[in-house]
Structure formats: structure tokens, C-alpha cells
Design a protein with these regions (language model features):
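Conserved catalytic motifs of the protein kinase core domain
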Residues: 54, 111-112, 196-198, 216
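Residue-level signature of transmembrane alpha-helical entry/exit and packing/kink sites
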Residues: 265-269
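An alpha-helical support segment within catalytic cores of ATP-dependent transferases
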Residues: 14-30, 141-203, 295, 301, ...
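Active-site Asp-x-Gly
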Residues: 198-201, 206-207, 211-263
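Soluble or luminal CAZymes and related metallo-dependent hydrolases
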Residues: 11-18, 41, 79-83, 127-130, ...
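ATP-binding pocket architecture of kinase catalytic cores
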Residues: 36-43, 47-152
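Phosphate/pyrophosphate-binding loops and the adjoining catalytic core of nucleotide-dependent enzymes
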Residues: 1-13, 310
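Active-site activation/catalytic loop segments of kinase-like enzymes and analogous catalytic loops
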Residues: 232-261, 274-293, 297-304
Length: 312
């Protein structure tokens, strides 16, 4: 992704009033005096409200359709929102704690809107053990028969290799020459094991995506980064996020073989996928210098490890 080769598409922007009108057209009428903005991340606007029957609901919609940034170029937010709807339903049907999907509206001329139950939260966090147990349950499921937005119809190893390489190019554009970086072909070869025994991976397991009450996980949200691949890819991300604690390992029933695999070639390449994303996020999108510097240091460490492997 040195310089995006495709022109960005014209953007239509939508307001809260536009989203509320979609609900009104479908006989779901939020009370305007109850609307309250929630943290929506990068892709979506999220509001809590009460409907005409005084039920607490959450509405989630994009204020524009297309994602254009150095991490993701030309991603369709409508597809992301549909994926969120589908994966919340899938996860809920299989015992993963998630908010219930109330409705999904896709009008021809307005924003698509996802309506969810509102889960009351109190600012507490779940234990790492509970997160480990939940992730183990998720990874034990046969994956749904769908293509995720992040992966499309490509095999996991190639898509992860391609995204890693593109983001390495972005990093070089921003900080200068990295001296050495693996090619897409080299990364694809290292990552080939993630194509076997593929499972649904959430790929953004962090406190911002945990809806909690009384230190219990009540809802796992934001499935935008989901992939279908071998769980080592998610475990590597959790490790680089700093979440692979002994308590998580206990809940997940992490074996010594799983743990050691994270420090071999495939595991290092999986870690690299997360670190390049974080580098671009902190360098180009959030512009957080201290965090960017820490991730750049980690990036160089991982590149050094990969550069000395016999598989390259």
C-alpha cells in the first residue's frame, strides 16, 4: 500500500437523523430525547436510545460508506455492518456472549442500520480466565460458511501475507528504509500452516470490545477484523496486545506446544501481522508517537528474528 493505486469513491455522508429516519420508515421509532452517543471506534457511529415501547436499544450505522486509510483501503462499511450482524447471530447461537440482534435495515438510499439490544455495563472488566474460556469456545466451533470482509475469498496465508507486506511499505514510506523485509511469497510460505483446521477468529480481543457487568463478560462486540484461519493467528494477536497472561492461558487451556509455536517461524509471522497493523495505526491514523515508537522497535525485533530463520 505504498500509494493506493485506486481512486477513492465519492462519499455520501449520513447523520444521526438519517439513521433515525431509516428506523422510522421501518416502524422502529427511537425517542429522540433518549439518544446518547456511545464510543463507536473508527468505522461506525453508535447510539443508545429507547424505542416507543421504552425498550433500551443500540443503533449502529456508518456516517460514510467507504474506509480509506493506510491500514485499509476501499473497505465497504455496509459489508462490515452486515458481517457484524451475521457474526453476532452466529456467536450467540453457539453460546458466545453477544448482544441480541433486533433488526437490520438496508434501505436503497440511506445508511444501513444495525439495531441491537442494549447491554447494561458498569465499567468493570472480565477476568483473563473468562476471556480465555470464551476464546477457547469460539475456536472450538466449526466456522460459519461465509467470507469475512478482511479476508474475502482468499486463503488466509496469502491474505495475511499481502496485508503485512502492504503495511510494511506504508511504514517504510513514513519512517524510511527498514533494511530488510520479507516478500509476499516468503510470508505466504511461512504462514501456510494457518490454512489448516481453520476457525472463526475475532482478531480484536481487547477491553474496548468487552461489554461487562460485575466483572463478567456479557457481550463480545466489533467483529470487523474477523478472519477464518488457524487459532495461532489470533493467539499471536492476543500476545502482541499483551493479553496472553497465565490466567488467559488457564482459561484457554493453552498447551506448552501452542505457546512455543508462537515463537517459531509461523508464530513470528503471525505476530508480525499484528505489529505492522499497530505501527500503521499509531503512525498514520492516531499519530501517537510514544506508542508508534514502541511498535516500531518491536517490528524491527520481529524482522530480525524472521531474517535469521532457515525458512526465508
Amino acid at each position: 500500500m505504498d500509494e493506493p493505486c485506486e481512486e477513492s469513491l465519492p462519499q455520501t455522508r449520513w447523520s444521526l437523523e438519517d439513521a433515525a429516519e431509516v428506523l422510522h420508515q421501518n416502524a422502529l421509532k427511537p425517542k429522540f430525547n433518549t439518544l446518547s452517543k456511545l464510543h463507536g471506534g473508527i468505522e461506525f457511529q453508535i447510539y443508545s436510545a429507547r424505542d416507543s415501547d421504552d425498550h433500551a436499544i443500540v443503533l449502529k450505522y456508518p456516517d460514510k460508506r467507504w474506509v480509506y486509510n493506510d491500514n485499509d483501503w476501499g473497505i465497504d462499511r455496509f459489508q462490515l455492518l452486515r458481517q457484524e450482524c451475521n457474526l453476532l447471530k452466529f456467536a450467540g447461537e453457539h453460546g458466545i456472549p453477544v448482544p441480541e440482534v433486533i433488526a437490520y435495515f438496508a434501505p436503497p438510499d440511506g445508511p444501513e442500520v444495525l439495531v441491537l439490544e442494549q447491554i447494561d455495563v458498569d465499567g468493570t472488566l472480565p477476568s483473563d480466565t473468562e476471556i480465555g474460556e470464551t476464546v477457547r469456545k469460539l475456536h472450538g466451533l466449526s466456522p460459519p460458511a461465509l467470507y469475512t470482509v478482511a479476508q474475502g475469498n482468499q486463503i488466509a496465508s496469502f491474505k495475511v501475507a499481502e496485508l503485512t507486506f502492504k503495511r510494511l511499505n506504508v511504514i517504510e514510506r513514513l519512517i524510511g528504509d527498514l533494511r530488510w523485509k520479507p516478500t509476499v511469497e516468503e510470508l505466504d510460505r511461512l504462514l501456510a500452516p494457518i490454512n489448516t483446521d481453520a476457525r472463526l477468529l475475532h482478531m480484536d480481543l481487547r477491553p474496548a470490545n468487552y461489554l461487562c457487568r460485575h466483572n463478567r463478560l456479557m457481550g463480545l462486540i466489533d467483529w470487523s477484523n474477523a478472519l477464518i484461519a488457524t487459532p495461532i493467528l489470533e493467539l499471536a494477536r492476543i500476545a502482541e496486545y499483551g493479553g496472553l497472561s497465565p490466567e488467559f492461558a488457564t482459561g484457554y487451556q493453552l498447551t506448552s506446544e501452542m505457546s512455543s509455536a508462537l515463537d517459531r517461524e509461523t508464530g513470528i509471522a503471525c505476530r508480525l501481522y499484528t505489529v505492522v497493523m499497530l505501527c500503521v495505526l499509531f503512525l498514520a491514523q492516531l499519530r501517537l508517537v510514544d506508542k508508534a515508537e514502541r511498535q516500531i522497535s518491536r517490528l524491527k525485533e520481529l524482522l530480525g528474528l524472521l531474517g535469521h530463520t532457515s525458512a526465508i
